[in-house]
Design a protein with these regions (language model features):
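N-terminal segment of the mature folded domain
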Residues: 1-13, 91, 96
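Generic low-polarity alpha-helical segments
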Residues: 1-2, 45, 123
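Residue-level signal for pocket-adjacent positions within structured domains
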Residues: 3, 11-13, 26, 69, ...
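A conserved helix-loop-strand patch within extracytoplasmic ligand-binding domains
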Residues: 5-64
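Small-molecule-sensing regulatory modules
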Residues: 55, 60-184
Length: 184
């Protein structure tokens, strides 16, 4: 099976194995604007997201803004943004990019710590299916596997699930080859 890894439980069910972790796509959250960036300075700006993690980080940075709940698939969330009085909505960059619908004026929210394993695809299979495990190893990206393993261990230690307002990012600093970690 193929999954968005951020939605996979940190402890896999008995009999299920992680067969491969694909190279991470863009892990950033992005802001899709309704109009211009002028709303950032407005005390009552309104942003939409369905994520408690995004809401908490947004309000920490912009405490006078309002955050409204936004649910549904990517296309329905974009449609809701277009049909409401919101100033923008926060999305996972990888989701929009995989669908080829990232707006050109979307803003990378590099300050926002993503969900653990955001932007990562995982392949799972039965733990006794050696043929599938061997075949999928060609897809496995070791660096991504290590980094998301750290992020998911952080999530597990905090006893959080995919809906908990927990952010985590592990990455390899290319100059030093050291793993850096940010968690919130």
């Amino acid at each position: 099976a193929v999954h968005s890894m951020k939605d996979v439980p940190t402890v896999l069910p008995q009999g299920i194995a992680q067969a491969a972790v694909l190279k991470r796509a863009n892990y950033n959250d992005i802001l899709v604007l309704k109009g211009t960036e002028e709303f950032f300075g407005q005390p009552n700006a309104m942003i939409a997201t369905g994520s408690l993690r995004r809401k908490a980080q947004w309000l920490n940075r912009y405490p006078t803004h309002k955050v409204v709940d936004l649910r549904g698939n990517v296309n329905s969330r974009l449609e809701k943004l277009a049909n409401n009085e919101w100033d923008g909505a926060v999305f996972a960059a990888a989701g929009l990019e995989r669908l080829g619908i990232r707006p050109a004026d979307a803003i990378n929210l590099g300050w926002m710590i993503p969900a653990p394993a955001q932007g990562v695809i995982m392949v799972s299979c039965r733990d006794n299916d050696a043929e599938i495990i061997e075949a999928t190893q060609k897809l496995n990206d070791y660096e991504t596997q290590v980094c998301v393993g750290i992020e998911r261990e952080f999530l597990n230690l905090l006893e959080g699930g995919c809906t908990a307002p927990i952010g985590a990012l592990a990455y390899v600093e290319q100059k030093t080859q050291e793993i850096n970690f940010k968690g919130i």
